[in-house]
Swiss-Prot record:
Domain remark text: The N-terminal region contains the highly conserved SGGXDS motif, predicted to be a P-loop motif involved in ATP binding.
Taxonomic source organism: Bacteroides fragilis (strain YCH46)
Residues that coordinate or bind ATP: S27, G28, G29, A30, D31, S32
InterPro entries recorded: Lysidine-tRNA-synth_C, Rossmann-like_a/b/a_fold, TilS/TtcA_N, tRNA_Ile_lys_synt, tRNA_Ile_lys_synt_N
Taxonomic lineage of the native organism: Bacteria, Pseudomonadati, Bacteroidota, Bacteroidia, Bacteroidales
Record's subcellular location: Cytoplasm
Protein family: Belongs to the tRNA(Ile)-lysidine synthase family.
The EC number(s) this enzyme carries: 6.3.4.19
HAMAP family assigned to the protein according to its UniProt record, in alphabetical order: tRNA_Ile_lys_synt
Keyword annotations of the record: ATP-binding, Cytoplasm, Ligase, Nucleotide-binding, tRNA processing
Enzyme class: ligase
Entry protein name: tRNA(Ile)-lysidine synthase
Role description: Ligates lysine onto the cytidine present at position 34 of the AUA codon-specific tRNA(Ile) that contains the anticodon CAU, in an ATP-dependent manner. Cytidine is converted to lysidine, thus changing the amino acid specificity of the tRNA from methionine to isoleucine.
CDD domains: TilS_N
Protein's gene: tilS
Length: 435
């Protein structure tokens, strides 16, 4: 019986126990309906979670009405959440598919905790796993992308990976259980559906058992991936710093390309970008590569990895306090880098806080000649990322302070000074000077 196969799979993969509460993700489609009916018939305690993404007009409401009826007839507690998926996708600059995925899994986990469920059960099956392998191959992937869908990912479990789509449909027909059909699954519209409706039928002409062959291959690769991931984990410890990747250490590894892929691919960098990054390792610093929310900057000795903040900051991430004092023999000039001291009588123009820019010059404190800010920062071995984050305080057109770094000699205090201006960095996330 199909129940025995699913029960054996749950036990083999240690997905959950009979006394655990299972939160079943219920779309109303054949797969999720079969999952709920199977688990209930096997004696598991289930609650259901349904998402209404409002993407398919009347179909979305039809699906909700169906799962309400199904859960009512089955005596299953149902939880429903409505999402403005289009607005979320627009705000986050992601696809509708990705938006729906993020929204539903975030809500599933929140609901799981609220309901004290042990796991979230999704209805992925063998065919889904095969499609995932092919999709990853088409996009470009590492060894982990060839493993297909795994039985467990944290609190998310997939009890139906032991079944094919055909077996699921046959089971529903056997128990005379209806379900709803998502019309988009029948349209050659999304990439996964192109694989399902176009590519796989062609592959089956070459090998009628192609799905089973792919599943067997993923199982063989799983053991190899375990060893591979252990080696990658050890390599990460050798090459990574809090700022990024040590280039020299990476190049000493036996497979630097594979390590680079495993570090950067999860951050949204595709295979072409990673190849381009690899080719810059021996080159000059300065190149910037953008992933999805992250960027890599080729510096002298490091590949700097940081969140993408390329949009120009309109305000500095700190607050300055300006105070004026009489300059007497008892006055002690502060020495820390977060404080600047100026001769007040040399300041007769408005002040401005801004990012430094190419061509900026100043006279570093203690020197007599002008120096380009870019050269100063390079001499101080600032990384490219640190250079981008450097702000300056200007009086009129002249730079008075590389904030947090060094003041300009033209505004220094001397024996003729009568009044001093003290400027201090006192906190983050503000945009003005207090006087």
């Amino acid at each position: 019986m199909i129940q025995n196969r699913v029960a054996q799979y749950i036990e083999k993969e240690k997905l959950f126990c009979l006394n655990d509460k299972v939160l079943v993700t219920l779309s109303g489609g054949a797969d999720s309906v079969a999952l709920l009916r199977l688990l209930l018939s096997m004696g598991y305690t289930c609650e259901a979670a349904h998402c209404n993404f409002h993407l398919r007009d009347k179909e979305s409401d039809r699906d909700e009405a169906f799962v309400r009826r199904l859960c009512h007839e089955s005596g299953v507690l149902l939880h429903i959440e409505h999402f403005d998926t289009t607005q979320y996708a627009t705000k986050k600059h992601i696809s509708i598919e990705m938006a729906a995925r993020e929204l539903r899994y975030e809500w599933f986990e929140t609901l799981r905790k609220q309901r004290e469920a042990s796991v979230i059960a999704t209805a992925h099956h063998k065919d889904d796993s095969v499609e995932t392998v092919l999709l990853n191959l088409i996009r470009g992937t590492g060894i982990n992308g060839l493993l297909g869908i795994r039985p467990r990912n944290g609190n998310i479990v997939r009890p139906l990976l032991c079944l094919s789509r055909e077996e699921i449909i046959a089971y529903l027909q056997y128990i005379d259980q209806d379900y709803v059909t998502d019309s988009t699954n029948l349209l050659d519209e999304y990439t996964r559906n192109k694989i399902r409706l176009n590519l796989l039928p062609l592959m089956k002409e070459i090998n009628p058992s192609v799905k089973e062959s792919i599943i067997r291959t993923t199982n063989y690769l799983n053991d190899a991936a375990t060893l591979y991931n252990q080696s990658i984990g050890e390599a990460r410890k050798r090459i990574l710093t809090p700022e990024g990747i040590r280039i020299e250490a990476l190049l000493q590894e036996p497979v630097p390309e594979a390590i680079l892929f495993e570090v950067l691919h999860p951050l949204g960098f595709n295979t072409t970008q990673i190849d381009n990054i690899r080719q810059t390792l021996d080159g000059q610093p300065g190149k910037v590569f953008l992933g999805k929310g992250w960027r890599v900057i080729k510096d002298r000795d490091l590949l700097l990895i940081e969140e993408d903040t390329t949009a120009e900051e309109s305000q500095p991430p700190f607050r300055l306090v300006m105070e004026e004092y009489d300059y007497t023999s008892e006055f002690i000039i502060p020495k820390d880098k977060n404080t600047a001291c100026f001769d007040a009588d040399k300041i007769n123009k408005t002040w401005e806080i801004r990012k430094w820019k190419p061509g900026d010059v100043f006279i570093p404190f203690g020197m007599t000649g002008k120096k380009h800010v870019s050269d100063y920062l390079t001499d101080k071995k600032f990384s490219l990322s640190e250079k981008e984050k450097q702000w300056v305080l200007c009086f009129g057109e002249q730079i008075a302070w590389l904030i947090g770094e060094r003041t300009d000699n033209r505004f220094k205090v001397n024996e003729n000074t009568k009044r001093v201006i003290i400027v201090r960095i006192v906190s983050e996330h503000s945009d003005f000077i207090e006087e």
